[in-house]
Amino acid sequence: MLETKRLILRPFLESDASDLFEYLEKPAVNCFASMKINSLEEAKSESLKRAKNTEFYFAIVLKETGKVIGEIDAYPDRTEPGESDTPPDTFSPCWMLNEDYQKKGYAFEAAYAFFDYLFSKKGARRIYAYTEDYNFSSQHLCEKLGMRREGLFMEFVSFVKNPDGTPLYENTMQYAILKKEWDAQKAINK
């Protein structure tokens, strides 16, 4: 469990289903389209799935009310093929917030604590994130976290279909930060 001034980042519980349903009933960006939930029963099942991953998957919870307003997770990425015994040192995070709680600094607060957790407790050497070229909020968040833009992948991935059924390919930006950059940034901001 991680704690910030206004938030608690903790593993999901089955009782988080209604809050999960609230923000996954209509995902805000295409990359979350496959996570769409159609019923409270489906949300309960998804809450239980998320609850099984307690190391890298957290509910973002308002301290004041206990309401789940989003989630943040990371996918460990092995840098060398065949090193299954070696702990990963590269992570790709993903964050999603209920639209009613966006633009209030919660995403930054959660991501900052989560990045610090990955760097200080999980041995991260590098963290990288993908965001669509139209998702200016996520781009701004990456930059605020001290991540540098590393590239733009044209027509990189398709999450949804065009009206004619063909894939709608989206342009994707990659941002990243190294542990030494994170540590230097933290030292300056002390």
Give the positions of each predicted feature.
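Acyl-donor (CoA/ACP) binding surface of acyl/acetyltransferases
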Residues: 1-27, 31, 61-190
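Short linear motifs in intrinsically disordered
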Residues: 13-15, 47-50
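Conserved GNAT-fold acetyl-CoA-binding loop/helix
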Residues: 28-49
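Short, intrinsically disordered/low-complexity patches at protein termini
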Residues: 43-44, 53-56, 161-163, 173
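A short helix-loop-beta-strand connector motif used in the catalytic cores of GNAT acetyltransferases and
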Residues: 48-59, 70
